[in-house]
Amino acid sequence: MCNVHAQQGSAQEAPPPGELLLIDKPLDWTSFDVVAKVRNTYRKCGSKRKVGHCGTLDPKATGLLIVATGRKTKEISQLEQLDKVYDGVIKLGAITASHDTETPEEQLCDVAHLSEAELHAVAATFIGNRLQQPPMHSAAWHNGRRLYEHARKGEVIRERKAREIVVHRFTITNVALPFVSFELHVSKGAYIRVIADEFGAALGVGGYLAALRRTAIGEWQLTNALSVNDTIEQIHNNASKGALCGTASTIHPAT
């Protein structure tokens, strides 16, 4: 999902040059929180520009978020087509309504009988094309309302429109039951929370996403990202030098 928040100048103003910022989204921040922070920082520095992001991260997820500004917001639709890579942890032996830590655990059960071989074998069955329904606790639309709005009213929409995704890689990296660490390489639009829920269901014990960190979007790597605070500091430093584009976290797609 991509979102662009416009800061409109006068009709005579030329659109400002833009940048693509690699930001490490903190825990419990929404992607919109990060966009708002960047947008407000530019405003305080006297620069009016569009600011948007590509690839929404849930509040309980951390990691790579690409924030586009100025003319670079035109590249968001291209960037959102890229594959994503994640590191995460699934907790087995329980489920939650949101498929992550946002809601309480339910249906607890024992997982001591599970073997590592079984975990690897089930993970392998997820590789390839598959249809995935968006979770009820998500921003997907249904009849003009977000699914999470229905969920907050206790409504369950069973005819949620499924989308086709591709799981390129699902690797179990560590097992310390009930926790299973993994790496996932998926196509655009994949809900990792749903994969965690389906993984637990396939094992017959239930499961939910206990932690998630995005490490790559296409060729863009988390290792090159800045924290929110460091990004804000870069913007202020560049403003003081009279150069608001070209920060250390700016990236330029290959041409």
Curated annotation (Swiss-Prot):
Give the matching NCBIfam families: TruB
Biological processes annotated in GO: mRNA pseudouridine synthesis; tRNA pseudouridine synthesis
User: Is tRNA processing there in the keyword field?
Assistant: yes
Protein name, UniProt field:
tRNA pseudouridine synthase B
Native source species: Chlorobium chlorochromatii (strain CaD3)
UniProt family annotation: Belongs to the pseudouridine synthase TruB family. Type 1 subfamily.
Q: What is its EC number?
A: 5.4.99.25
Q: What does this protein do?
A: Responsible for synthesis of pseudouridine from uracil-55 in the psi GC loop of transfer RNAs.
| Active site per UniProt | 58 (nucleophile)
A molecular-function term among this protein's GO annotations: tRNA pseudouridine(55) synthase activity
Write out the catalysed reaction.
uridine(55) in tRNA = pseudouridine(55) in tRNA
